């Protein structure tokens, strides 16, 4: 979650995840009615890896609906802020339960690493399956490693 903009942000660790996350970003955007950021770092953008392809799916054409409530003018800002806060709560719940974030248990479960993006690949390359890794692709809240109650 991008704390300042209160937008969800996906951080892929390789080319295949980039492809999957673009599709996931569109799904999340439709579900939560919000833009979704895809954070690309130079290492991933310049990398090459095997990518699985899927059958192309043509999206349904949705007619344009003029919605002035989405135009940020003083008149709309108070209601928009309420909607953003409600959406943020829903996104936090989603981030804490999504299959995008995963724990990979290693041989030594007394040691764990919290990673995202390319640091996941670095940790796997150096440590292999020796330690447990919490791989966080979609973070939640201001402190992305803590759950709220």
How should these model regions be labeled?
Residues 1-4:
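Flexible glycine/proline-rich, aromatic-decorated loop/lid segments
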Residues 12-149:
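Flexible, low-complexity linker and terminal segments
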